[in-house]
Amino acid sequence: MSMEDPFFVVKGEVQKAVNTAQGLFQRWTELLQDPSIATREEIDWTTNELRNNLRSIEWDLEDLDETISIVEANPRKFNLDATELGIRKSFITSTRQVVREMKDQMSNSSMQALAERKNRQALLGESSSQSWSSGPDKYSRLDRELQLANSHFIEEQQAQQQLIVEQQDEQLELVSGSIGVLKNMSQRIGGELEEQAVMLDDFSHELDSTHSRLDNVMKKLAKVSHMTSDRRQWCAIIVLFVILLVVLVLFLVL
């Protein structure tokens, strides 16, 4: 384990991002609790910045999870013990809990109602600071501002949904690419197996042919051996007969 470990680089960035997000969250809470200290633009900016920071932290935590999975798959290569892995997992879990708590607070119904009330109060404050010539024009202007605020909220929700859809599309593309790679690998393996099957079939035919030829050769050798044995027997009989005749002749002569 060294200081060049990429985990610590990403960990430092995550800690900085968490500190920034906590500061934004504190400011966001203050803006909602005290309607007189900020405008609607500041509330919107703080809300968007906070959400973007939390989303970025979640992505970084996913990257850290992947690094831990890689290390667990091959612990000898990275030379990390179980204690160090436990510390890293604990950091990811605690950080993810902090992010989840802030997101839960932002999505809480009471906090959303407080945010909407703050937006309305900011609109009323901005509207009251302007000089309008008549009462009906004042309320129509306020109504337009409220509609604009609602439109802004709807656009923000649509943007979030679009971001989710894009992330899902990216994940589907990754899955599709992996499936394509596996399909190509399976096709190659299938082709190689077919080629090997053909080679084995050809080898089997050649082996059968060789075995048949070997049997024929062995039969011919057996015949030749048998013939040679018969010739030797006849030669031995003739030699013995000649010796017997010689002995008889010598006996008669002597």
From Swiss-Prot:
Where in or outside the cell?
Answer: Golgi apparatus membrane; Golgi apparatus, trans-Golgi network membrane; Recycling endosome membrane
Provide the topology term for how it sits in the membrane. Answer: Single-pass type IV membrane protein
* Chain ranges of the t-SNARE coiled-coil homology domain: 162-224
Membrane-spanning parts: 234-254
The UniProt entry, under CDD domains, shows:
SNARE_NTD_STX6 (cd21447), SNARE_Syntaxin6 (cd15851)
The annotated region (Disordered) lies at 103-138
Q: Which stretches are Cytoplasmic in the membrane topology?
A: 1-233
- A Pfam family hit: STX6_10_61_N
State the superkingdom. Eukaryota
Coiled coil segments of this chain:
46-72
User: PROSITE patterns, per this entry?
Assistant: SYNTAXIN (PS00914), T_SNARE (PS50192)
SMART domains, A to Z = t_SNARE
Any one cellular component term from GO for this entry? phagocytic vesicle
Q: Which UniProt keywords apply?
A: Coiled coil, Endosome, Golgi apparatus, Membrane, Protein transport, Transmembrane, Transmembrane helix, Transport
Q: Which GO terms describe its molecular function?
A: SNAP receptor activity; SNARE binding; syntaxin binding
Q: Which Cys-Cys disulphide bridges does the record give?
A: none
**Biological-process GO terms, alphabetical:** endocytic recycling; endosome organization; Golgi vesicle transport; intracellular protein transport; regulation of protein localization; retrograde transport, endosome to Golgi; vesicle docking; vesicle fusion
Q: Which PANTHER family match?
A: GOLGI SNARE BET1-RELATED (PTHR12791)
Q: What does this protein do?
A: SNARE promoting movement of transport vesicles to target membranes. Targets endosomes to the trans-Golgi network, and may therefore function in retrograde trafficking. Together with SNARE STX12, promotes movement of vesicles from endosomes to the cell membrane, and may therefore function in the endocytic recycling pathway.
The UniProt family comment states: Belongs to the syntaxin family.
Supply the name of the protein: Syntaxin-6
Q: Which organism is it from?
A: Gallus gallus (Chicken)
